[in-house]
Amino acid sequence: MKMICAIYRSTKRDQTYLYIEKKDDFSRIPEELLQSFGEPQFAMLLDLAQRQRLANADIEKVKQALTDQGFYLQVPPPVESMLNAYLDELKNSEKTE
């Protein structure tokens, strides 16, 4: 069975995507989310039933969110702080000495 979704890029947030059930149907998207997302730019249609995985999202979470709430918001992974990485490395080196 097909599970087609439309994917849109955010104009306000880099690497942020909105997956929805039907192209150009934003009726199930909360108004606050649409305002912070910006003008959605259509990226592609995708049949989730034909895929086993997605590049930057858990496909099962995407399918479940589309079924439950009618959309899935993909945000970029957090950028690791160089300071935190350095401090963690420092702590680990102190433990081994």
From Swiss-Prot:
Gene3D superfamilies: YcgL domain
Disulfide feature: none
Domain YcgL: 3-87
Classification via Pfam families: YcgL
Domain of life: Bacteria
InterPro entries to which the protein is assigned, alphabetical: YcgL-like_sf, YcgL_dom
Record protein name field: YcgL domain-containing protein PMI1171
Lineage: Bacteria, Pseudomonadati, Pseudomonadota, Gammaproteobacteria, Enterobacterales
